[in-house]
């Protein structure tokens, strides 16, 4: 990924208020193109046309949860190597260790600070870009 920049963020979140705060924070902080999906199924349906540089993924969603969504994204050629970051209120050390062991690049606790979300996402992406 040498020379690649962070331009496109996919955020999968079922809560409308959280989606909008995150969208605003990311667009404001980095002028990123942010695509929002309400479910794992929706995310899987758009990754063929929207090629994200990083994926932010809620863990607890109805239907396909974040873990199942990550597993499905990893099986797709377009997203097999894209860093996936879980955003969740479940941040006990055992849970975080489990998410990382299953392949998450990082975990951002909810509630998150909108003022620092963009910088946090960029930092995580840079750690995994090289």
Regions found by a protein language model. Name each.
Residues 23, 68, 91-108, 119-123:
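Alpha4 helix (beta4-alpha4-beta5 surface) of REC/receiver domains from two-component response regulators
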Residues 50-56:
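Active-site beta3 strand of CheY-like receiver
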Residues 61:
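Receiver (REC) domain active-site loop signature in two-component systems and cognate sites
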Residues 13:
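Conserved acidic carboxylate
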Residues 36-45, 66-68:
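Helix N-cap/capping motif at the beta->alpha junctions
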Residues 1-10, 115-130:
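Non-catalytic signal-transmission and effector/linker regions of two-component phosphorelay proteins
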Residues 16-35:
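Two-component/phosphorelay signaling modules centered on CheY-like receiver
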